[in-house]
Design a protein with these regions (language model features):
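Proteins with a high burden of low-complexity, intrinsically disordered sequence enriched in S/T/G/P/A and R
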Residues: 4, 23-25, 89, 251-254
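A conserved active-site cap/scaffold subdomain adjacent to cofactor or substrate pockets
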Residues: 226, 231-263
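Nucleotide/pyrophosphate-binding catalytic subdomain
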Residues: 14-239
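Residue-identity detector for glycine
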Residues: 3-9, 19-21
Length: 263
């Protein structure tokens, strides 16, 4: 199943999308630095709640907060430096689950119903490659039910369930891939990736003040940049976006500046 993303920002003029008889549907992904503290959680929650109040069906995908994934890895290696990849995946998945619960509660404090979902509760099915699993499909029934009930599903990124019923993780940056997969199987109108930078640059703007931002960049050029060390998007997310024809928007989680369209 494929989906087509639509460009543009999250303006106040958004209205229910009548072109297919459904509300406009948006998937938004928030990275760990975008959720690192209560203030940042509230900023993201207000953006999500605002869209919901405009009649938009919005799904959030969240990463683990701050450096929590690194802390979980350190804890696991402390108890067993050679622990199994299966158990490591089970441990690491907890970081995103915590973020999802905190985000759902933060949205709820704004008077909007939200529900946190693990990757498997959201229907994400993967192969059995622990630590680097690939998404095979998304069973969207639960997500569709929650959207129909008027809730904001907050999905723990980076994780899924393999054919044996075990938890898997998608590798570093895997929450980007989660967002693209949900956008594809839910036939979302937009897939927005919120980060700590306001788009895709030809060089790291935190190191090079004269770095130039792309207004738009092709999938292939984006993959080339990733191959050269750019970390703004996970390579598998761009590959999946290209395969499923999902247009991505890379945006700052902290400013209203225009971002970069990928695709």
């Amino acid at each position: 199943m494929t989906g087509k993303g639509r460009t543009g920002g999250t303006s106040r003029s958004l209205k229910p999308y009548a072109g297919r008889g459904l509300f406009m549907r948006i998937v938004q992904k928030y990275g760990g630095t975008s959720l690192a503290d209560v203030r940042k959680l509230r900023l993201a929650a207000r953006r999500l709640a605002g869209l919901h109040q405009q009649g938009v069906q919005v799904v959030a995908v969240v990463s683990a907060q701050g450096k929590l994934t690194d802390e979980l890895i350190a804890r696991a290696r402390q108890v067993n430096p050679r622990g199994s990849v299966r158990e490591m995946d089970a441990a690491l998945a907890a970081g995103e689950q915590l973020s999802a619960s905190l985000m759902a509660m933060t949205i709820g404090a704004l008077g909007v119903e939200a529900v946190s979902l693990t990757g498997w509760q959201a229907g994400i099915r993967t192969d059995g490659e622990h630590g680097a699993a690939r998404i095979l499909r998304v069973d969207t029934q639960r997500l569709e039910q929650e959207l129909t009930r008027g809730r904001i599903p907050v999905v723990a990124g980076f994780q899924g369930l393999d054919p044996e019923g075990d938890v898997t993780t998608l590798g570093r940056g895997g929450s980007d891939t989660t967002a693209v997969a949900l956008a594809a199987w839910l036939r979302a109108d937009r897939c927005q990736i919120f980060t700590d930078v306001d788009g895709v640059y030809d060089r790291d703007p935190r190191i090079f003040p004269d770095a130039a931002k792309f207004g738009r960049i092709s999938y292939d050029r984006m993959l080339t940049l990733i191959g050269s060390g750019a970390q703004v998007l996970h390579d598998r997310s761009v590959e999946l976006a290209k395969e499923k024809n999902i247009r991505l928007e890379v945006l700052s989680a902290f400013t209203g500046d225009p971002g970069t369209i990928v695709g």
